[in-house]
Structure formats: C-alpha cells, structure tokens
C-alpha cells in the first residue's frame, strides 16, 4: 500500500513538473499579450485556427492560447488567472482531473483549456451538476469566449430540438450531465438524421467530476414508455410483507431455525425471505411453490415490497410531497425531480405510503454515466475532493487526479472528532457549540447526512431561538442564495450532504477576525470525500476557519461498521456514564477505517456495474451503429435486406426439413411461406413432395427478387422505395431492441441466483446476454422478412 501511495505521489510530482514548464511559457507571453490592442488580441483566434489547419497541434499552441485567454479574462471579466490556475488549466487540457480546493477559482481555471480546445471547432462541453450552474457559468464566462470570437451555447431541458442543435453546434456548450446523456439516447431513437441534435462527442470538462463520475456512476439514464401494470399486484404484495417479522439472528448462529420471515444484510442493503417467509407467502397466496415459473411476477412484486418497506427509508431515501414519492439523492441531499426508481420499486414505495400508484415504465433506451462519458475523445474534470477516489478515476476513466497547489497557505483548523454515546447527547452538544459561536457573531455551517437530521436540528435551534436557514432536498430553489449568505456575520446554515456545491461561501465584513466560517459535521458520511467537501467550505483562499465532526454510537456508519469496537473503547476510557465524551485521533482513525471499507465496497459495486453494463454497451454500439447506417443511407437498402431475408429463409427451411423427407414438417413449412413470404396461391404451386431443399430455397429467393421488382415498379420513385425500406427496418429494430433491453434487465435481476450453483454470475450474464442478442438479431431478420414481403405498398409512409 505504501508503495502505491508513493507511486501516486511521484506521478503527481512528475506531472506538475511537466505542467510547470508549460506554465512558465504561458507567463512568458504575458507582457506581449498585454501590449496588444483589443482588436489585435481578438485577431489571435482566427490566427490560431489557421495554424491548426496548417498542422500545428493544440499542445504547440497551448502557451500562446492560454496567454490570450488569460489576458482576455483580465479585460472582460476583471479576473487574471494565478499561476496555480494556469497549472490547473494545463492539467485539464491533458485529460486529467484537477483537484483544486474550494475558492481556488475552478470556473476561471477552465476558461483556458476551453478556449484552446474550442479552436478546433469540434465542440467543447462544459458539464455541471445542475441547470442553475450551467446558466450562471454560460452567462459569466460566455462573455469572455464571445469577446474572443467563439460561439457559446446553453443546453437545458426545456429547449426544443432546434434550440438544442444550435447550442451543440457552438464552439463551447454548457450543459448538465443528465441532459447530455438523454440527448445522446434521444439522438439514437430518431428516425431522420435531421432530428439529431448532438455532434460527435469531442472534449468535455466536468465540474464537480466526483459527483458525476463516482456518486452517480451507477445511476442509469433511462428513457421510458408506459407499460401496462395492475396496481392491485403491488397492493397485495405490500399488505403481505407488512405482516412479516425480521430475522435478527446472527448469520453464524448454531441452530438452523429461522427466527423471522425475512433477513436484511445492512452492509450490502440486501433483503430476502427466509424459509419461514416463503412458507407464509405460499399460504397467503394459496400456492404450492412460490418460485414456480407462473409465479415469477408475484415473486418480483414481493421482492420490491420487501425493499420498499424495510430497506428504503422515508425522509432519507425519498420524501413524500403532495401525494407523490420523490427520490432524494443520497450524496447531494437534493430531490431528484422527474426521477423514478425503475423495475417497480417506485410503485412498491407508493403502495407502502398509500399514495396513488403511477404506471410502471418500460425502458426504451438506457446508458450509465460511466459508459456515456467514456465515449468522449478527451475527458477531464475539476473537483475539490478527488484524491480519495484516484484509483477508480484511473482504472475506469484513465484519468489521473492531480492535486493543484493552493494560491495561499491553508489557515483552517481541522479538529479531531468528538464521540458521544447517544444521538441526544450529541445533538445537545452541537446546539451548545452553535450557541457559543453564534453569540460572538461567528457564522456556522452545520452539515447533516439526512433530511431527518437537518429537520431535528432546525427544531432544536428554533427552541434555542437561534435564527437559521435550512438547505436540503425539500428546499433547494433558493439554494445558491442561502449558501452565498452562509459566510455573513451571525449566519447559521444547516446543509444536507453539502447541497449547494458550486457556489462559494465568501466571508462577510469582520468575520475573519472572529475565526472565519465554523463548520460542524453532525455525522460522518460513508464517503470521506463528502466529509472533505463539507470541510472545504471553510478556509477558502487562505481564510481562517474551523471544522469539527460530532459523532455518536447511534450514527448509521457506527452501527454498520465497527460500532462495538468503539463502544468497548468508550467503556474502557470512562467509568462515569454521563460523561462519556471522547475527543481522540484514534476515534477519527477508526471512523476513517470504516469509511475506507465502505468506499472499497462501493468501488467494487461500481466496477461490477460497469462490467455488467459493458455487455449492454457493446450491444448498444452495434444496434445504434447499424441503425445510423440505415438512417443515413441515400440509396436502396436492397443489399442489406436481401441477405437478411435469405438468412431467415435458410434457417426456417433447415428447421422444418431435418432428417429424411418423411420427417419434414410440411404444414409448418407451408405456414411459414404463406404467412411470411408469398401468397397462398404461390405456396400451393410448390410441389413439396418432390422438391429438394436447395431447389426450394432457390425458388423462395426468386420469389423475394420478384417481390422487390414489383414493389419498385409500384412505387416508381427510388426515393419512395428507400423510404419504405427504412420504415420496415427501423420499426422492427426499435421494437425488438426495446424488448431486448427489458429482457436484459430481467436477466440482470435474476442472474445473482445462479451464483448459488457455483457459477460466476458475470460470466453467466455475458453468455446469456450474447445468446439473447443473437436471438434478437434472428427475430429482427424474421420480422423484417415478414413485414417487407407482406406489407402493402403505400405512398407517404411515415417512419
């Protein structure tokens, strides 16, 4: 481990040394650029573009282009990037993650690599976590790019396809990660090329890169259509699971008896029925075997009802507002508008909460952020907290995390954690600490892990008559404004999981003298990175600051990992029950060790998700690629259709003519020909008693050829024939692909059970997925054959 850390440290040092050489060259151009008139500085953009056309690389242009962007920022924005910001910009240009502390000016840092890479004219995407930040940065930084002669676009959810296309055609496009992903999926569902909005994915700079590529890595982007689903099934399953009791016995208990109906494994958050639970289900629903094939849907509903009732927690995983279940992002604490849990879980929660059950949706297209962002030709990112996830960034995205030095030394005091035996004693201590600091006017930012905690704290502060602002998933409309005021004298702000990232907390007048912003964490998050984000809100740009975490043995992390060890430690250190309060670096280390275990588990899960998703990625690329060839075709697709139809004929004829002639299934063969290829009259004219297999195939090929000629004559215009061919292929491919996505999703859900048979679930998924894909291709070819051969020719077809 020590060797790995040493190697990473040396990589940082080596890369920074390389970047320093470039940064020195950038600064050498500073005087030259400052002497240019506005017109001369602006003329550099067309000059650079001409030099790129003549073969000069972006790396060659870097020193001059960065110097131009830097001088432009001084004139347009009144901001002049520091040396460390130049280093950050260079790290971004070379496809790395620049780890820069809060307040070090990440937004300004990005202007230099954005300008340089936009000169190619292939498009640069600046990616943010929400539309407020996209709009803000496009408005503020867009002034600089436009002044330098670049086009700048903003891509937001409410735009029409034409507006989106215009935004994507700009040199620089600001967008959220979700909008980019959804636009990609929608582009691969269009039936006319003109309906597409995106260009090929060239270069992206992701702001808060850890939030998008780590925290949301497993979140699939899904475009759905509604599917029929009886709501009563969810209610029946919900009523049943509410009668069950939990088996809380240890896994290593000596007896084989069940001590309840279901068992939860909290570290992995999995839940399953025990044998007793299975027997109860059979009795409740009047079944002999719960896991019979015909009970598959019921089992699925019971599984989701168990998760909804006993794993998913109200006000932590979701909130209920105005009779609607809304998902809460566990990392940002924000409500995820418009998002629904898939696979019936959302409906199961709606049944649990007794609100209206909405229709289950059917997935039409899906991709994870992991696979979407890996499609960019070059990818880079910025964050204040990326080093803890360096291995994951390197392994999955091939990106180094480069820690950029701060412009001024850090003056913030990070104090050791304090541990209390109960939640009540902890919250009492937190309120006392806030009172003490508030009395002298020092601003306090209190970080919570769940909405529940923020509401409890808010209630306690109300009782103490301390005015405060609450920032959580239930109140994010004024998020930026609340955060901007959090550094003012006397301000007390409660934030869930550091909602409000991307907005700086600037200290108000006289606050430095009071010790700067005091940050109090009321619980450790399972990720050290989220804790570091909270800490990093204090002490920006060398300001003073103070941070401390208050913990209790009843905290979720303590209960899940290492609680007993810490409790024993607590008992040994204190005999007085009322005074069991410990401030110790040992506690901090114990907590960090628990966090590392969780982070390791989470990384393994994300890595596994990617391995499974890679199966779909390969299949998606094949289907989307073939689909695009059909859409872009400008001459007849006969050379695509004829081989498809021939393969269908071969497989069907071979299937029905196995063995000697007496074993041929002639009725089935006739049915295939009359239903998929020819009229009954033509079918009846074939002498099946004497014809050989090869002659039959040849005769059917001739029927196909004649059908083609008849259709071409009937339509007359080759462009109409091409349109007909496109309609046939696209309709079939889209229908079958949607079915396949659904089937792959069900396979993914069920594949874990095969692990019990000493089989590797991933290998099983890959093998089964490949077979299902092959089967889908055969089905596509069969459907295309029938639709093309049997469809009536009409003018004015619509795709």
Swiss-Prot record:
Its BP terms in the Gene Ontology are: intracellular protein transmembrane transport; protein import; protein targeting; protein transport by the Sec complex
Which keywords belong to this entry? ATP-binding, Cell membrane, Cytoplasm, Membrane, Nucleotide-binding, Protein transport, Translocase, Translocation, Transport
Q: What is this protein called?
A: Protein translocase subunit SecA
Where it sits in the cell: the answer is:
Cell membrane; Cytoplasm
The catalysed reaction is:
ATP + H2O + cellular proteinSide 1 = ADP + phosphate + cellular proteinSide 2
GO terms for CC? Answer: cell envelope Sec protein transport complex; cytosol; plasma membrane
Q: Per its record, what are the GO molecular function terms? A: ATP binding; protein-exporting ATPase activity
The residues that hold ATP are 85, 103-107, 504
Gene name per UniProt = secA
Matching entries from Gene3D superfamilies are given as: Helical scaffold and wing domains of SecA, P-loop containing nucleotide triphosphate hydrolases, SecA, preprotein cross-linking domain
Report the function annotation for this chain. Answer: Part of the Sec protein translocase complex. Interacts with the SecYEG preprotein conducting channel. Has a central role in coupling the hydrolysis of ATP to the transfer of proteins into and across the cell membrane, serving as an ATP-driven molecular motor driving the stepwise translocation of polypeptide chains across the membrane.
The annotated subunit structure for this chain is:
Monomer and homodimer. Part of the essential Sec protein translocation apparatus which comprises SecA, SecYEG and auxiliary proteins SecDF. Other proteins may also be involved.
Q: What SUPFAM superfamilies does the record tag this protein with? A: Helical scaffold and wing domains of SecA (SSF81886), P-loop containing nucleoside triphosphate hydrolases (SSF52540), Pre-protein crosslinking domain of SecA (SSF81767)
């Amino acid at each position: 481990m020590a060797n790995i850390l040493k190697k990473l440290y040396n990589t940082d040092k080596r890369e920074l040394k390389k970047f320093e050489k470039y940064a020195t060259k950038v600064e050498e151009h500073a005087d030259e650029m400052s002497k240019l008139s506005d017109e001369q500085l602006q003329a550099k953009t067309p000059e650079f573009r001409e030099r790129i056309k003549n073969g000069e690389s972006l790396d060659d242009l870097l020193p001059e282009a960065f110097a131009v962007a830097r001088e432009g920022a001084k004139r347009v924005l009144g901001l002049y990037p520091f040396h460390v910001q130049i280093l950050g910009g260079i790290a971004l240009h070379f496809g790395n993650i620049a780890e820069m502390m809060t307040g070090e000016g990440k937004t300004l840092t990005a202007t230099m690599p954005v300008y340089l890479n936009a000169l190619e004219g292939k498009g640069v995407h600046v990616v943010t976590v929400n539309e407020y930040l996209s709009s803000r940065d496009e408005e503020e930084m867009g002034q600089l790019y436009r002044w330098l002669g670049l086009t700048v676009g903003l891509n937001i959810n409410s735009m029409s396809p034409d507006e989106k296309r215009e935004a994507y055609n700009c040199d620089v496009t600001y967008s959220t990660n979700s909008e980019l992903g959804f636009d990609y999926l929608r582009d691969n569902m269009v039936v006319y090329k003109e309906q597409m909005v995106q260009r090929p994915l060239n270069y992206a700079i992701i702001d808060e890169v850890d939030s998008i590529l780590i925290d949301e890595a497993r979140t699939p982007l899904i475009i759905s259509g509604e599917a029929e689903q009886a709501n009563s099934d969810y209610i029946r399953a919900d009523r049943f699971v509410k009668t069950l009791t939990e088996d809380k016995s240890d896994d290593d208990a000596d007896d084989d008896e069940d001590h309840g109906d279901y068992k939860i494994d909290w570290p992995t958050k999995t839940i399953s029925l025990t044998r007793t639970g299975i027997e109860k289900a059979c009795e409740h629903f009047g079944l002999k075997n719960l896991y019979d094939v015909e009970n598959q849907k019921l089992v699925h509903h019971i599984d989701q009802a168990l998760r909804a009732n006993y794993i998913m927690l109200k006000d932590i995983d979701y909130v209920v507002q105005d009779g609607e279940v809304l998902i809460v992002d566990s990392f940002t604490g924000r409500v995820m508008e418009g998002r629904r849990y898939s696979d019936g879980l959302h409906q199961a929660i709606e049944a649990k909460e007794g609100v209206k059950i909405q229709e289950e949706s059917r997935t039409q297209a899906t991709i994870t952020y992991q696979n979407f962002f890996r499609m960019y030709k070059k990818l880079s990112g910025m964050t204040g907290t990326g080093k803890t996830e360096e291995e994951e960034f390197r392994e999955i995205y091939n990106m180094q995390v480069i820690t950029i030095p701060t412009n001024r030394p850090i003056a913030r005091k990070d104090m050791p954690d304090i541990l209390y035996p109960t939640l009540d004693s902890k919250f009492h201590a937190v309120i006392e600490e806030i009172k003490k600091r508030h009395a002298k006017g020092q601003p306090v930012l209190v970080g919570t892990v769940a909405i529940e905690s923020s509401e409890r704290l808010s209630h306690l502060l109300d009782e103490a008559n301390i005015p405060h602002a609450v920032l959580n998933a239930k109140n994010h409309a004024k998020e930026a404004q609340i955060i901007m005021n959090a550094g003012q004298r006397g301000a007390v702000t409660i934030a869930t999981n550091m909602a409000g990232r991307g907005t700086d907390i600037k200290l108000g007048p006289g606050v430095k003298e009071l010790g700067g912003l005091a940050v109090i964490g009321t619980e450790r998050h399972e990720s050290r990175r989220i804790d570091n984000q909270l800490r990093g809100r204090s002490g920006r740009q060398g300001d003073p600051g103070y941070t401390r975490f208050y913990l209790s043995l009843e905290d979720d992390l303590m209960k899940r990992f290492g609680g007993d060890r810490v409790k024993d430690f607590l008992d040994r250190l204190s005999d007085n029950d009322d005074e069991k309060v410990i401030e110790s670096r040992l506690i901090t280390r114990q907590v960090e060790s628990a966090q590392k275990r969780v982070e390791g588990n989470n990384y393994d899960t994300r890595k596994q998700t990617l391995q499974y998703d890679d199966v779909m990625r390969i299949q998606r690329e094949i289907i989307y690629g073939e689909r695009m060839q059909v859409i872009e075709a400008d001459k007849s697709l006969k050379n695509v259709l004829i081989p498809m139809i021939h393969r269908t004929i071969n497989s069907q004829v071979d299937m029905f003519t196995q063995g000697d002639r007496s074993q041929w299934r002639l009725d089935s063969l006739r049915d295939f020909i009359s239903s998929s290829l020819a009229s009954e009259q033509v079918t009846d004219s074939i002498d099946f008693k004497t014809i050989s297999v090869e002659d039959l195939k040849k005769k059917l090929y001739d029927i196909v050829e004649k059908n083609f000629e008849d259709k071409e004559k009937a339509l007359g215009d080759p462009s109409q024939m091409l349109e007909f061919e496109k309609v046939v292929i696209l309709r079939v491919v889209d229908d079958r692909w949607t079915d396949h996505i659904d089937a792959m999703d069900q396979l993914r859900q069920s594949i874990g059970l095969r692990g019990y048979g000493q089989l590797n679930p991933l290998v099983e998924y890959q093998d089964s997925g490949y077979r299902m894909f092959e089967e889908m291709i055969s089905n596509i070819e069969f459907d295309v054959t029938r639709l093309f051969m049997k469809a009536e020719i009409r003018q004015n077809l619509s795709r």
